[in-house]
């Protein structure tokens, strides 16, 4: 059995394969998320992984998740981050995703997404967004950086 996670983001696409085969790769998304999804299918085929095989399950997330026509399931980025954060850092943690188009801050409590914030501007305002998030979380920007440095995942 192979489990494949595909995140087609606005600037980069990430793929992780777990199971009887293990692999990961990153590639630029480019102008067309749909073409990127097909490029990923081709790369997996080169690795002798057939996404149509009954023993392969594909989950897609990210801005381009809808165009991964071979995905068995699509999941929002917030949900994926929550599950990944719980797996890597425990049931109570904070995840910060600085992406190509936005930044998300996700808070987990008891293993569930408790709250999340997202900037509503392009990534040009990312620094200001971190400052606003620190203020919202009741910490200084320096404390936020220290907290990030203490992360183990």
Identify the meaning behind each predicted range.
Residues 63-115:
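Conserved phosphate-binding catalytic cores of ATP/NTP-utilizing and phosphoryl-transfer enzymes
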Residues 3-7, 55-57, 93-97:
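Short glycine-aspartate micro-motif
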Residues 2-43, 113-122:
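Short glycine-rich, Thr/Ser-proximal phosphate-binding strand/loop in the N-terminal lobe
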Residues 38-42, 79-86, 127-134, 142-145:
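Predominant activation on well-ordered alpha-helical scaffold segments within soluble catalytic domains
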Residues 110-149, 153:
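Glycine-rich phosphate-binding loop plus the immediately following alpha-helix
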Residues 19-29, 48-79, 114-116:
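Short beta-strand-loop/turn "lid" adjacent to the catalytic site in phosphate-handling enzymes
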């Amino acid at each position: 059995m192979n489990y494949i996670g595909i995140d087609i983001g606005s600037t980069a696409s990430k793929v992780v394969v777990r199971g009887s085969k293990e692999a990961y790769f990153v590639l630029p998304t480019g102008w067309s998320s749909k073409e990127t999804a097909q490029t990923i299918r081709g790369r997996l085929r080169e690795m002798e992984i057939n996404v149509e095989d009954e023993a392969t399950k594909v989950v897609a997330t990210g801005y381009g998740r809808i165009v991964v026509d071979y995905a068995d399931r699509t999941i929002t980025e917030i949900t994926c981050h929550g599950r990944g954060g719980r797996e890597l850092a425990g049931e109570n943690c904070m995840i910060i995703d600085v992406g190509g188009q936005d930044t998300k801050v996700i808070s987990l409590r008891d293993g569930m997404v408790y709250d999340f914030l997202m900037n509503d501007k392009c990534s040009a305002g990312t620094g200001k967004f971190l400052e606003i998030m620190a203020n919202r979380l009741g910490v200084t920007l320096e404390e936020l950086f220290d907290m990030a440095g203490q992360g183990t995942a």
